[in-house]
Regions:
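Histidine-acidic metal/acid-base catalytic patches
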Residues: 1-8, 12-27, 90, 100-102, ...
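Hydrophobic residues within beta-strands of alpha/beta enzymes
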Residues: 31-32, 63-65, 104, 149, ...
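Active-site-proximal loop/turn and secondary-structure-junction residues that shape catalytic pockets
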Residues: 10-12, 35-37, 68-71, 110-112, ...
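Glycine-rich, proline-tolerant flexible connector loops at the mouths of alpha/beta enzymes
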Residues: 33-56, 111-114
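Active-site acidic/histidine proton-transfer and metal-coordination neighborhood
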Residues: 15-18, 57, 74-181, 235
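Catalytic-core regions built around general acid/base machinery
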Residues: 47-59, 134-141, 199, 236-240
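The substrate-binding groove and active-site-proximal loops of carbohydrate-active enzymes
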Residues: 37, 75-83, 187, 228
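Metal-dependent catalytic neighborhoods of phosphoester/phosphodiester hydrolases
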Residues: 42-48, 77, 82, 261-262
């Protein structure tokens, strides 16, 4: 079974339809739609119908969407901000359902660069409470539309909560597995200096998605390299995913091309790697 997918995030210099063309040409059966980067508002009516036709014409399955990030998060530090973004996330849950996706990726907390008074010592507590309120609002909506929200580990060097699988696992255990899971971003693990094997084990059976890319440093921007172009041990990674009986998609999210390499060539390189790595 070919359980691979490729993120449109890998095509920053292309429209969403051009990204779909390249993903299809590279041989992937499924795609993760980057919302915010490629679709900034949920499509409706004729635009929605046309987009579904574009997916079908390329024989691509929209396996997941990535909700807008940046300001759009569960753990906003003011109630006005939180309500606004929870409403945005609800609208994208509906969009995910409308295009036949099963999962939506969410950043649980904001990047400190977006947080007013980012060093406020009360921020961790404020964020924890905000995340809970947002999830209490969104879980019934996700259930209604048949979408699972997957919370992503994040590469922020700060004292905010919910940046690792270890922390996120404790959070998602409080909610139904059909509506809330985890997505492991491998590059973010590397940026944070965490151990990929331990993060996978911490996620365990609540791991429902992956963002697969390599990393060669501990700063934002050191990740999103092609597989085996950084420091991650991909054999150990796959072995551990098999040990926890991971059955979700293998979604590749490389963005950084090498010199004179196009975005489509990076997707093809990654596809070649995936076929060997996963024995497709």
């Amino acid at each position: 079974m070919d359980n691979t997918s490729y993120s449109t995030a890998g095509f920053r210099n292309k429209s969403v339809l051009e990204a779909l063309d390249s993903i299809q040409k590279s041989g992937y059966p499924s795609v993760e739609i980057g919302c915010g980067s490629h679709i900034d508002q949920p499509l409706k009516n004729a635009d929605l119908n046309n987009f579904n036709k574009e997916l079908k014409s390329r024989n691509l399955k929209a396996r997941s969407i990535h909700a807008p990030s940046g300001l759009t998060t569960l753990g906003a530090t003011t109630e006005e901000w939180r309500i606004k973004e929870a409403t945005t996330l609800a609208s994208f849950i509906i969009f995910a359902s409308d295009i036949g996706a099963s999962d939506m990726v969410i950043h649980p907390i904001p990047n400190p660069i977006f947080v007013p008074d980012a060093d406020n010592p009360n921020n961790p507590s404020i964020m924890e409470k905000a995340v809970a309120r947002s999830l209490d609002y969104l879980i019934p909506i996700a259930e209604k539309y048949g979408i699972r929200m997957n919370l992503e580990n994040l590469p922020y060097h700060c004292n905010y909560p919910y940046r690792s699988m270890k922390e996120l696992r404790l959070l998602v255990e409080q909610y139904p597995a059909d509506q809330l899971g985890l997505i492991l971003d491998t590059g973010h693990v590397g940026v944070m200096g965490d151990e990929i094997v331990e993060e996978i084990k911490s996620a365990g059976d609540r791991l429902k998605g992956t963002h697969l890319h390599d990393v060669n440093g501990n700063q934002d921007g050191d990740d999103h390299k092609g597989p085996n172009r950084g420091i991650l041990n991909w054999d150990d990674m796959l072995k551990t995913l098999k040990e926890i009986q991971y059955s979700g998609p293998y979604t590749f999210e490389p963005i950084v091309t090498q010199e004179n390499e196009t975005e489509e060539e990076l997707a093809i390189f990654t596809r070649t790697f995936a076929k060997t790595w996963l024995s497709i």
